[in-house]
Amino acid sequence: MARPIVAVVGRPNVGKSTLFNKIAGERISIVENKPGVTRDRIYAEAEWLNYQFTLIDTGGIEPESEEIIPAQMRRQAELAMETANVIIFVVDGREGLTSVDRDVAELLRKTKKPVIVTLNKVDTRHQSEHFYEFYELGMGDPIEISASLGLGIGDLLDEVVKNFNPEDYNQYDDDVIKVAMIGKPNVGKSSLINRILGEERVIVSDIAGTTRDAIDTPFTDGDDRYVLIDTAGIRRKSRITESIEKYSIVRAIAAVEKSDVCLLVIDASEGVTEQDKKIAGYSHENGKGMVIVVNKWDIIEKDNHTMNEFIKEIRNELTYISYAPIVFVSALTGQRMNKILEEVKHVSNQNAMRIPTGALNEVIGEAILLNQAPSDKGKRLKVFYATQASVKPPTFILFINDKELMHFSYLRYLENKIRENFGFEGTPIRFILREKTGRD
């Protein structure tokens, strides 16, 4: 199930980033250190009362150039409208209600999404003298917090999770393959979608998604049911030059959250860009199936080695998604377009595949015989047995004697052996290490 998205919105200097960091806690550093993922602290994974959600810091989207504050706020509010399931509207409890706050509230009201008015910088147990001013906004009871001191955060998060509605982010049946078309602007995502939804497809209906210009389009291909989650509408916003890249990434986050399989579209004339790495990294982190689609292949001058050289470049630049199949296509000419849905279906099946425990342990045992487990100071790693815990992504529990003895390189070796024997093309694999003694 996709995680709900919570956006932190507010005019500059009301403490959005402080609140973001307080809610996200140490998770930010974990996200930052993973390969291919943005270091701009635009998003973080958070959890409260067993609810997992994605936190978006719209403060990180603000352009650096000197612009009129209401214009900046309009962009923030638009971003919240398009991506969030719940909006935290941060205001300054010391300063009171301002005209900019009123303008932002008016924009947020139009979203018809849950908005929680949050008075920050209330650093004492005494109520802000401006508390009742915020009832003028007509957005329910304000919540007082101090992000810097951590006061009231629990009450705020209680209110946030109360507003989660599973129907908002889990619209489709389990047998529908949800496909997100992701990638930086101007790589041909819209053209690819038009090709996929050609006359030979049966378009069921158009359902407005959680993003305003992204349309979720269900369709069938034979007996298979799909829904395409389109983020191509980001190109229409290209006038926001200062923040276009960050904006694109946030839009991709919303699409990835809803998807089973991501199509990472790369422009053949540009190769792999930094933004491609960031978007691919987010999909990988979230355990989504992945197909790399190299578009505009028709305009590339080729010889017998061109495709192999391009594959090598992609593998070198996107090492952490080496499992993803690569398809070279042209939306303009229709070249190899039939391969896309073939790979999507295959990857979706691989992402949901279960391996019998007996077969899994046989492969693990043979792998250990071929390449002895590491040791340290006379103590050798022992893998007692393995079992598959879940799918989407495939997740395996390894019961071992000592976690400290499991080197990253050896875990990668075991992963490669599992892939060699069972496949899992196009999907990340997760491992959970659990210690037990031989007597357990």
From Swiss-Prot:
Residues annotated as binding GTP 2: 183-190, 230-234, 295-298
Pfam families in the cross-refs: KH_dom-like (PF14714), MMR_HSR1 (PF01926)
Gene3D superfamilies (alphabetical): 3.30.300.20, P-loop containing nucleotide triphosphate hydrolases (3.40.50.300)
Residues holding GTP 1: 10-17, 57-61, 120-123
Keywords on record: GTP-binding, Nucleotide-binding, Repeat, Ribosome biogenesis
Keyword Metal-binding: no
Record-annotated EngA-type G domain positions: 4-168, 177-352
Entry annotated with the keyword GTP-binding: yes
GO molecular function, one term: GTP binding
UniProt cross-references to InterPro entries, sorted A to Z: G_ENGA, GTP-bd, GTPase_Der, KH_dom-like, KH_dom-like_a/b, P-loop_NTPase, Small_GTP-bd
GO biological process, one term: ribosome biogenesis
NCBIfam families: GTPase_EngA (TIGR03594), small_GTP (TIGR00231)
Subunit-level organization: Associates with the 50S ribosomal subunit.
Protein family membership: Belongs to the TRAFAC class TrmE-Era-EngA-EngB-Septin-like GTPase superfamily. EngA (Der) GTPase family.
HAMAP family linked: GTPase_Der
The protein's name in its UniProt record: GTPase Der
Organism field: Alkaliphilus oremlandii (strain OhILAs) (Clostridium oremlandii (strain OhILAs))
Top-level taxonomy: Bacteria, Bacillati, Bacillota, Clostridia, Peptostreptococcales
Gene that encodes the chain: der
